[in-house]
Every structure is written in C-alpha cells, then in structure tokens.
Amino acid sequence: MARDYYDILGVSRSADPDELKRSYRRLARKYHPDVNKEPGAEDKFKEINKAYETLSDPQMRGRYDQFGEAGVSSAAGAGYQDFGDFGGFADIFETFFSGFGGSPQSGRRRSGPARGEDLRFDLKLKFREAVFGGEQQIRISHLESCKTCEGTGAKPGTRPQTCSTCQGSGQVRRMTRTPLGNFTQVSVCPTCNGQGQVVTEKCDSCGGRGQNQVSKKLQIKIPAGVDTGTRLRVSNEGDAGQKGGPPGDLYVYLFVQEDSEFRRDGTNVLSEFKISYLQAILGAQLPVKTVDGEETITIPAGTQPGTVLTLENHGVPRLGNPVSRGDHLITVIIDIPNRISTEERELLVQLASIRAEQTGKGGIEGFLGGIFGR
C-alpha cells in the first residue's frame, strides 16, 4: 500500500500551507538528484513531489483527506517542481547544519496543547456494498480525555507543576565542542518527557495519564464507488489531544472482498455468461445477473465465443459523482455439449448436409467448428 502523503513530508494532518512548503523544500533539497547521488534518492524525490503537489492544492488535499489516493486525480504526478528559489548550494548547506545549533529558540518543543494521534481501522466490504455504498457500524477503541481531572492527569483540587529540570521548556541542552565550533545538542527532557510539567498527585481515575481507553460504536457512511485502498476520514474520532489539544482523526481503510459472479475494472463490472450453442446460432433474449438485479440481454444470432456484450450504466458509480456510472461488460461463453441424443445428432447431420459441410472423423464437431470458427 502507498505511503501516506503526510508521512512522506513529515508533517501532521493539521499542517498549514507554510509548514507544508517548509518541509517540502527541506526534503527536496536533501533528495534532489543534482545534490544526492545515492541509489533511490531520485525515487524519493519524486515521491516528495507527488505528495506536495497533492497537499498544496486545497481541493486535492480535501479529496485526499477524505478518500486517500483513490480520491486524487491521476494527473497529480511525479514531475519536478520549480527550484528557482532554493538559493543554490549555500542554501542547502545552511539547511543541513541548521539542526545542530543556531538560535536558542530554533526547534523549541512546545509544551502546550498537543493534537491527539490519528487512528486506523481496516474495514472489509462485500462487492455490492462497495458499488452502492451505505452505512456500516464499527466498534473502535480510542483515548478520551479523563472526565475526572479534565485531562490534566492531576488529582482534583491539585494542578501539574512546572518541571524543575527543564524549567517548563520540555527540552534540555548540552554544549558540544567540535573542530567546526561549538554546537548545542537539544534533547527531550527525561524528567517530564517533553511536557514541561510534572504531576505530583495523580488522578485516581486515569493514573495521571489524563486519558482513558474507551470503546465505542460508530456509524460510518460508505460512499458509492469505493474500492480496495480507499480511505475515509472520520474527524475527531482519533485519540484525545493533550492539555486541551484537539483530538486526532480516525482513518478507515476499505478492503473489498472478491465476488463469485462479478469482477471490477475501474468503474466497469465484468462477468461471464454461459449460453448454449443453439442460442448462439439462433440468438435469444435471456435474463442475466447484474449488480442492479436481473436484466434482459439480447444475444445476436451468430454470436461467437468470447464476444463481449455491454450493458451501459450498469457498472460502478464514480467516486464522488454517483450519478455517473461505468458499464457492465459480459463475456459470452458458449457451452458445446460433450454428448447429444441420437435425435439431436441426426438433426445436426442434416444441417451439416444443408450447409454442404464435411463432418469428418470428429462427426458433428466439424460442423460446429465451421460455425464458431468464422
């Protein structure tokens, strides 16, 4: 399965356009083929480009957030972006070394509200459920803010204290001397785990975590036309945020089960339909199964094996535009019997004589071969 575009760019799903651009430029500098000659760098560069091209467009980003790659136009491609504003090698050098020092405020970890983690749920659908959509009830388990301590983790009547090790910054710094100069190494505070605060009297309900694991049922709306790999976003149903931060989202990944009668090719439904050799020769009006139910199909006289008949607008609705549907393509399979009655054989021999066909050693098979080999 393809990697998540947000993970490729190393940003959260709530990242604003400026944050997306900064991350994109940083990664593009790192993996640009003119700079990075390592194997796989060019493929990584194209992957970064595709992710940014999708997420930098508000409309495409919205479709990606809702449906994943299935909702994004295939035109969002892996072409190179314009690098005219990168500032050359000096800019790349500056980017590379910016993580080793610089302003005391650079890379400062915020100890304030933090968004909750996103969650994933895999959901299996039957073929027709994927075609027409509908609603599915699922049960998930996620973290919710503790109602007793209101998410602080502290016992009611008390409050978290500022960490004395990092003075509330969530980070500790260490100066390192190198031949290139002095550099400041920044790491997460081991006392408060980067939170900037410590809980001295823990809440009895959540054990000081500020969150509890809760199981709940959700009603999920499945759009018509989804397929394996389609991803649906359910806002605010991920894990609860910390310190009043917003909850994450729930991402439902869909997997469509195989069907005994139908297959799918894009928005077209494919199936096979077996008819007798007489129906193929004479033609017929026959009932055939479709995803919409039973329909009548016309078999033209002289239909050949492997003929594909089309039922228009009986395919899969287009994702996001259910009014538009594909077609149902039916491949005709002609059933030639291994055994026939004496009466049938006599009649077929007469037909062969009328057509001046030679039955040959195989008997009537020569006649049938003459018909179906045209």
UniProtKB/Swiss-Prot annotation:
**Details of cofactor binding:** Binds 2 Zn(2+) ions per monomer.
From the UniProt record, list the CXXCXGXG motif repeat ranges.
146-153, 163-170, 189-196, 203-210
What domain of life?
Bacteria
What are the residue ranges of zinc fingers typed CR-type?
Answer: 133-215
ATP-binding listed as a keyword? no
Q: Where does Zn(2+) 1 bind?
A: 146, 149, 203, 206
Please list the cofactors this protein needs: Zn(2+)
Q: What is its main location?
A: cytoplasm
Specify which residues bind Zn(2+) 2 according to the UniProt entry for this protein: 163, 166, 189, 192
**What GO terms describe the biological role, i.e. biological process, of this protein?**
chaperone cofactor-dependent protein refolding; DNA replication; protein refolding; response to heat
Family annotation (InterPro entries): DnaJ, DnaJ_C, DnaJ_domain, DnaJ_domain_CS, HSP40/DnaJ_pept-bd, HSP_DnaJ_Cys-rich_dom, HSP_DnaJ_Cys-rich_dom_sf, J_dom_sf
Q: Does the keyword Mitochondrion apply?
A: no
Keywords, A to Z? Chaperone, Cytoplasm, DNA replication, Metal-binding, Repeat, Stress response, Zinc, Zinc-finger
- Cellular component aspect of the GO annotation: cytoplasm
Protein's cellular compartments: Cytoplasm
Which residue intervals define the domain J in the entry?
4-68
| One protein family per Pfam | DnaJ_CXXCXGXG
Q: Which GO terms describe its molecular function?
A: ATP binding; heat shock protein binding; unfolded protein binding; zinc ion binding
What family classification does the UniProt entry report for this protein? Belongs to the DnaJ family.
Query: Subunit comment for this entry?
Result: Homodimer.
Q: What is known of its domains?
A: The J domain is necessary and sufficient to stimulate DnaK ATPase activity. Zinc center 1 plays an important role in the autonomous, DnaK-independent chaperone activity of DnaJ. Zinc center 2 is essential for interaction with DnaK and for DnaJ activity.
Q: What does this protein do?
A: Participates actively in the response to hyperosmotic and heat shock by preventing the aggregation of stress-denatured proteins and by disaggregating proteins, also in an autonomous, DnaK-independent fashion. Unfolded proteins bind initially to DnaJ; upon interaction with the DnaJ-bound protein, DnaK hydrolyzes its bound ATP, resulting in the formation of a stable complex. GrpE releases ADP from DnaK; ATP binding to DnaK triggers the release of the substrate protein, thus completing the reaction cycle.
Q: Which NCBIfam families match?
A: DnaJ_bact, PRK10767.1, PRK14293.1
> What is this protein called in UniProt?
Chaperone protein DnaJ
Source organism of this protein record: Acaryochloris marina (strain MBIC 11017)
Q: Gene encoding this chain?
A: dnaJ
